[in-house]
Amino acid sequence: MSFTNVSHSIPYALVGLVVVAIASIKWLRVAQREHYVPGYVVRFASRWYFSRESTANTSIAVVLAFAFIAAISRPHSPEVAIPALALGVVAAVFSPVGLGYKGRSSKLAWTRRAKVLYASTLAITAVLSVLAYLANLSAGLATVFVIFSPLLMDLASYVTRPFERRALDPFVKSAAAKLDQVNPVRVGITGSYGKTSTKNYIAQLASESLTELASPASFNNRGGLARAVNENLLPGTQVFIAEMGTYQKGEIASLVEWVKPNIVAITAIGPVHLERFGSEDAILEAKREIATDASTVVLNVDDKRLAGLADELEREGRHVVRASGTDTAREVSVVKDDAGNAAVYHHQRYLGSTSTPVALSNLAVAVAITLELGVPEEVIGKGLGGLKAASSRLNVVTTEAGVTVIDDTYNSNPAGARLALAQLEAHASQGGRRVVVTPGMVELGSQQYDENRALGVAIGVAATHICIVGLTNRRALLAGAKEGGGRLITLLEFRTRERAVEWVRQNLGSGDAVLYENDLPDHFA
């Protein structure tokens, strides 16, 4: 290779392509975890490189900035272009520090979509490399490509997104036809949080009277729901319960178009996914799409915005059922009784209670839907006694060592975190240690720092130890925990959840309790 011919050199162009091929593997993992939403790879790259908590990555970002400036200012100079390319190659392959290729908790799955996105990223890079070669800018633009490999992947996401949507069309059409053929009552559930728990409660309470199918796990998007129907909906199924999630306006409307739910519910409106929507009013507008054509709408009217929506829909002639976790005057309500159990009422008539830790409003919505499905009150009352929490949502177990473990690792939100801390206080023995292991909460937009600081304050009051995992919300949690005072005596920091769990195993004993509040995949810092 001639070092003097850096402007018009196939080897230099190939270097850029090969390095992008390597670096893109870790960014593909990020894209997959973020549901292939265009723009999110660059967003996460920015977080990794410009986090206040990582001076190493910020320093690398500064070096890359100099390499970029050098590459575009003097692309024909081998004395400048070659060192700039070398810096870009090393940084692209080995940084950001902490973001691995394999991943500990969020490994890359080489699905068809992942392969298409990866190949598209390389194809775009190859085309740009050819153009760079023809423009006599091989080494200079190769440096730019390796530095901006996250941007190239996001560009590929934009390009392939329409094709991916069309690729799903046959599966969606098949699912819609199968729903029409089997013709179950269709229930749609959405909300900022509480969707999966509410779906789980409905399935349990209705199963004694009806043959039901609930969409598995968090299969709550177009592809997931189509797969759930195509693979699991059997002839004779009387009820299909579909959890419906959204990352942008119009997504739920596209689900409603083919699922055609008869009964729908909105569990809550809150700051979860606020960074994607921009405001809670925008979240409400996206969530209310679920009620477009439904004959029955169940709403958690403890939320003032949903109470207003209930009045609006009722004026339109809809059948609206108001559910509450505080007000027994509502059609369905769930409140704490003197024993601390969740007591369920229908038109102020007692149905039964459960000792299972639940978000009261979620259970109220679930009972309201189950009643609308025609399940008798006495069957619901009996089912409440054996109600189980959804996986990783306030599951409580006691280990052989006598440690109470509260697992609330799935999809933490401000309301759920408060409930989880109450459970920690309720289950800890007198004098026992109360430990919270948490990375904090994410996707809260402009409220993220304040909400995590508030969580830190609450932990400071309820716990004796806080184990902060990772860097994402470290500053906010630390500030809140120190401000909270209360029982808190120890602040611990761990780079990974595995290390925090190991500390818990080595240090806690009989009478102690630990709450695992949220668990972020490792593409978060």
Language-model-detected regions and their locations in the chain:
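Acidic, Mg2+-coordinating active-site environments of NTP-dependent enzymes
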Residues: I266-T404, S429-G432, V457-H465, N473-L492
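Extended acidic/charged loop-beta regions that coordinate divalent cations
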Residues: I69-L85, T111, T125-A135, R227, ...
